[in-house]
Amino acid sequence: MKELKPNVVKTYSKSSDLANMFQSGEIEAAVVADFAVDIIQGAAENVTYVVPESGTYANYNTVNIPKKAQNKETAFKFVNARISEESQKAKAISLNEGPTNQQVTLSEKEAKNKTYGAIAERAKTVDFNFINSQLADWIDQWNRTMNQ
């Protein structure tokens, strides 16, 4: 991190901050999840989203049913509606979310800037058990290195 620090202009907490930094010319490159690309390109249309050949990391939205849910049948209907082909396609188009339902087919234009197709096939998953076990140390190291 010490070697990277001189090249880090600042960090951001929401994609609109990043969009503003691109728009103002404050930055020229950033690490960003695909769902934020449309927001950034809305502010700075010359920005290009690139996924390295080595792949990207899949970032999942989840829908969960609590173990003690009182109306599990309705909850399962909600989950099924949420992952339906129709719902997933609509969210892919309107929210720039890569579909999890493999029955969803997107045109080349609709698939642009999404973890979909060949990009999704080479996406890696995050080991949250490992991350959570290291997180406190990483945050401490980040704060000592980057925030000094």
Feature locations, PLM:
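Periplasmic-binding protein-like
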Residues: 1-4, 44-67
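Sec/Tat-exported extracytoplasmic proteins
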Residues: 4-8, 12, 26, 41, ...
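Extracellular/periplasmic bilobal clamshell ligand-binding domains
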Residues: 108-148
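Extracytoplasmic/secreted proteins, especially bacterial periplasmic and envelope-associated proteins
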Residues: 3, 13, 17, 21, ...
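Ligand-binding pocket segment of bilobal, Venus flytrap-like solute-binding proteins
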Residues: 1-48
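Solvent-exposed loop/turn segments at secondary-structure junctions
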Residues: 35-38, 54-57, 70
